[in-house]
A protein has these predicted regions:
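Core segments of small alpha/beta cavity-forming domains
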Residues: 1-59
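Short, solvent-exposed beta-strand/turn "edge" segments of beta-rich domains on protein surfaces
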Residues: 2-5, 71, 101
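Short, charged low-complexity intrinsically disordered segments located at boundaries
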Residues: 38-47, 70-76, 111
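Short amphipathic alpha-helical surface micro-motifs
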Residues: 42-49, 59-64, 93-97, 108-110
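Surface-exposed, charged secondary-structure patches
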Residues: 52-92
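Compact beta-sheet-dominated globular domain cores
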Residues: 79-132
Length: 132
């Protein structure tokens, strides 16, 4: 239960950080491993290069369920299915809508893998994979 509580907070933090209009990963950096950070950062650079920015309103998380957990050596991986509702759109530099709808609630389905080293004194988990 404690893990899922933290996973829900991490999910909302990462989604809103990735989708805010500054095109930078800031508040969720410590929640991402290097590979995921680089993937997200590259996507944001490409969006920024096109002159686009995102607007998101996180409505809420409908569900978060542990789908699988696997221990490999000292590393524990937990796969979580999320269903959330957001309002999102991408705008260009002239504020014209490129995609999405700023007035429509959209349901999103994500499967994420969180990981932590069980021998580490750091209790925090990191996002290591997105499967959707």
């Amino acid at each position: 239960q404690e893990f899922l509580k933290g996973a829900k907070i991490a999910y909302e933090t990462i989604i809103t950080d990735f989708s805010d209009n500054d095109n930078k990963i800031t508040t969720s950096r410590s929640l991402l491993n290097a590979e995921i950070f680089n993937q997200f950062n590259e996507a944001l650079k490409q969006r920024s290069a096109r002159g686009h920015y995102a607007e998101i309103t996180f409505i809420g998380l409908n569900s978060a369920e542990i789908k699988e957990h696997k221990k490999i050596g000292n590393i524990l991986n937990v796969t979580v299915d999320f269903i959330a509702e957001v309002i999102t759109c991408i705008r260009d530099k002239d504020k014209k809508i490129v995609s999405g709808d700023p007035e429509k609630i959209k349901k999103i389905y994500d499967t994420w893998v969180f990981s932590r080293d069980t021998t580490s004194t750091n209790p925090n988990w990191q996002l290591v994979n997105t499967l959707t």
